[in-house]
Amino acid sequence: VLRGGTRRDQRSYTVGTDRTSGTGDDPLDAAQERRVRAVLALGGVPQSDLPDGVQQVRLRLLERAASGREAPRDVSAWAAVVASNLAVDWHRAKRRREQLGERLAVLREPVHPSGEETSLLSLAVAQGLDGLPAAQRQVLVLRFFADLQVRDIAEHLGVPAGTVKSRLHTAVRALREKLHEDEVV
């Protein structure tokens, strides 16, 4: 199986081995898989859907290799961006399902959280992330969790660096306001 090179060897696919069986059938190493799972989770994908998301990233990497295209310059960053895009897609699909459900159930009360305050900052941050627009959530996760630089995020998303900075600033401000509003921080 082909695996994109690391930052040190960034331009070639290399043969990799599966970390559990040694059979070479996994295009993502353990660290890359953990990063993909984390980006998906921080992007709001539920735990039950994380294995499917990781498989989608693997599939896209294998499809890229099979098509003969050049390996991503940084497979780990590429996989994080793909995972982030999958999280955005998951939210869009969820929104479509919810809209369909609302049409079918003419008068349905919106589901709200129980309102109980939580002392877990991580839960509050996750809820705050869910409340952000997809584009803002995406750059926030890529910058602060996937630890990508602004220029790398801009390159992977195909937007100007200024757009990434603007989205990042707006997202951080909105998340900070949400956490203060909920009296978490």
Predicted regions: what they are:
Residues V1-D18, E155-H156, V172-V185:
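C-terminal edge and immediately downstream basic/flexible tail or linker adjoining helix-turn-helix-like DNA-binding
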Residues R3-A41, Q47-V54, L62-A65:
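A short, charge-rich alpha-helical start-of-domain segment used by transcription regulators
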Residues S119, L129-R137:
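Short helix-coil-helix linker/hinge
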Residues V81-E102, E117-T118, T170:
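Arg/Lys-rich amphipathic alpha helix in sigma70-family domain 2
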Residues R97-S122, Q127, Q149:
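Internal acidic/polar
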